[in-house]
């Protein structure tokens, strides 16, 4: 395993991987082409200073925010550095670099970790460039109702992807999934994780962290935050759960505006979507009024505008008048939840967000949000792409070196790559070799036969018998060569399959499938610190790191 000083990130253009939307590729590599859709160049120092000035003026109530965050982080393991960061948020000059993710099982795919690392890396950079105190915040998104999306984690075992699924038997619409209390079944999933991870010096500590976080009776959002907190315990990362009555109360003005005029909030989103399509890009969002959900006892339901004064919970017969909905917002704001459009606006209404660290999909979402930020009277933060990373183990690097491959060569799948490598590595074309040799043998025997018959006419039959025997032996030799070639091809296929499974498991980028615990168990929890030193904050390229 490379030492921290030996580890370095090799950069690959995002387009070479064939895994990212064109909009994201241009955002990273040709910002001027998409500048019309965003508040500023994420790498520009003047843009950062302007974003910081706007962000510092924004929070709805810094005191309530800080008090709430202190209470929340106490549940997950509040250390002094995190406490200090939360107290810093009371300072009217302070700003935040924010990221967030759904509460995936065991932290979900690697990209959750890369989002966090990028956020932590940017704190000092933004402080130096803006002269302001900067706080790292992780938004714990537990209000989604798509349980299947967050209920599985994947690790590698013997170069195969092993899925670990938690199936507590919830309804199709369980409400805010983060609120779900873990059942006894979580212990079986943790045990399966234990079985899947190979023995190592680091395994006891890794599994202790997992078992401490994922206990029966614990809310899914709390388990997620506790494990993330233990992985980044020395970094002062502030976790924030928006599913809190105090934070929802602060967000009433934003939600009220959406209820009072829901078409006004969706119009700029859809207009930006049309503009993106006109430029040849994909529109990520097709918004419908409203941008809110109702968190009922029986699930999480989209609130649809039915006519000028009536709203219906999507998929049900339950309706509200506008005044009824506004009264409920005043009385129980915690019953309301933002959709994908209002979620970042709620975040930036509550926090002094100067920069948001986003994945490729989120970067595409934000391209449609400029107008809705204007509608809400908010300044959109700068959008900083998270680090996109492939971790290359030594066994995989050997395969890449042997066949002269890069991570980008795996973009089209295993079979096309296998065919390319076989053509390059096979030294003998068996069919061509024998197709050339057999006519030459026949020609030699044809020339020999009359000479032999001149000595003894009865030897002509012997010549033909010899011809037949030689042809049989040549066929046997050909089959031996074919079998030897197949063994070589099978070896090539096995080696490429190993590399493909590690780099593009199930055909997707490693960072979108594999869980970080596989690597921490094998290479030490210190790998996270190593990555912070190896990865660059210029995330315009995919970064390949040897482990």
From Swiss-Prot:
On the tree of life, the source organism's domain of life is Bacteria
* Database matches in Pfam families: CC_BshC, Rossmann-like_BshC
Q: Does the entry feature the keyword Coiled coil, yes or no?
A: yes
- EC assignment: the record states 6.-.-.-
Q: Which residues form a coiled coil?
A: 461-504
- The answer on whether this UniProt entry bears the keyword Ligase reads yes
By its UniProt entry, which InterPro entries does this protein fall under? Bacillithiol_biosynth_BshC (IPR011199), CC_BshC (IPR055399), Rossmann-like_BshC (IPR055398)
**Care to name a GO molecular-function term for this sequence?**
ligase activity
Keywords, in A-Z order: Coiled coil, Ligase
The entry assigns this protein to a family as follows: Belongs to the BshC family.
Among NCBIfam families, the record links this protein to: thiol_BshC
Q: What is this protein called?
A: Putative cysteine ligase BshC
Q: Whose protein is this, by species?
A: Salinibacter ruber (strain DSM 13855 / M31)
Taxonomically, what lineage is the organism?
A: Bacteria, Pseudomonadati, Rhodothermota, Rhodothermia, Rhodothermales
Name of the gene encoding the protein in the UniProt record: bshC
């Amino acid at each position: 395993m490379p030492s921290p000083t030996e580890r370095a990130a090799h950069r690959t253009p995002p387009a070479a991987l064939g895994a990212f939307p064109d909009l994201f590729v241009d955002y990273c590599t040709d910002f001027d082409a998409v500048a019309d859709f965003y508040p500023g160049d994420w790498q520009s120092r003047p843009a950062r200073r302007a974003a910081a000035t706007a962000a510092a003026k924004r929070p709805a109530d810094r005191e309530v925010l800080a008090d709430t965050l202190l209470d929340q982080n106490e549940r997950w393991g509040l250390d002094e550095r995190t406490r200090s960061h939360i107290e810093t948020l009371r300072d009217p000059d302070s700003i935040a670099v924010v990221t967030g993710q759904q509460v995936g099982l065991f932290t979900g795919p690697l990209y959750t970790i890369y989002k966090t690392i990028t956020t932590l890396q940017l704190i000092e950079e933004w402080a130096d460039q803006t002269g302001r105190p900067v706080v790292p915040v992780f938004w714990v998104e537990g209000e989604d109702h798509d349980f299947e999306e967050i209920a599985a984690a994947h690790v590698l075992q013997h170069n195969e992807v092993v899925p670990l699924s938690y199936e507590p038997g919830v309804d199709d619409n369980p409400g805010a999934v983060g609120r779900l209390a873990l059942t006894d079944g979580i212990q079986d999933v943790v045990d399966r994780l234990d079985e899947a991870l190979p023995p190592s010096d680091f395994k006891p500590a890794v599994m202790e962290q997992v078992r401490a976080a994922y206990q029966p009776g614990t809310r899914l959002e709390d388990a997620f935050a506790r494990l993330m907190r233990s992985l980044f315990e020395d970094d002062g990362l502030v976790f924030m759960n928006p599913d809190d009555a105090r934070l929802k109360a602060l967000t009433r003005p934003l939600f009220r505006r959406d209820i009072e005029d829901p078409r006004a909030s969706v119009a700029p989103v859809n207009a930006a979507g049309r503009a993106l399509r006109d430029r040849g890009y994909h529109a990520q969002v097709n918004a419908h009024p409203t941008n809110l959900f109702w968190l009922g006892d029986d699930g999480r339901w989209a609130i649809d505008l039915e006519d000028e004064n009536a709203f219906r919970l999507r998929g049900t017969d339950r309706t509200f008048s506008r005044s009824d909905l506004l009264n409920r917002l005043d009385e129980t704001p915690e019953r309301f939840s933002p959709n994908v459009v209002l979620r970042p606006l709620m975040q930036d209404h509550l926090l002094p967000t100067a920069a948001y660290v986003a994945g490729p999909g989120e970067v595409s979402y934000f391209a449609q949000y400029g107008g809705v930020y204007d509608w809400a009277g908010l300044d959109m933060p700068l959008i900083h792409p998270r680090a996109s990373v492939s971790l290359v183990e030594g066994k995989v690097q050997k395969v890449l070196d042997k066949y002269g491959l890069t991570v980008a060569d795996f973009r089209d799948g295993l079979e096309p790559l296998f065919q390319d490598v076989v053509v390059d590595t096979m030294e003998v074309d068996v069919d061509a070799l024998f197709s050339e040799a057999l006519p030459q043998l026949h020609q030699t025997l044809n020339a020999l036969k009359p000479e032999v018959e001149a000595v003894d006419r009865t030897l002509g039959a012997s010549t033909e018998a010899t011809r037949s025997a030689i042809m049989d032996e040549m066929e046997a030799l050909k089959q031996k060569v074919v079998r030897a070639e197949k063994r070589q091809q099978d070896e090539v296929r096995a080696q490429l399959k190993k590399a493909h499974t590690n780099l593009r498991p199930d055909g997707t980028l490693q960072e979108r499938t594999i869980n970080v615990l596989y690597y921490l168990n094998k290479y030490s929890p210190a790998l996270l610190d190593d990555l912070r030193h190896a990865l660059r904050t210029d995330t315009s390229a995919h970064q390949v790191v040897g482990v």
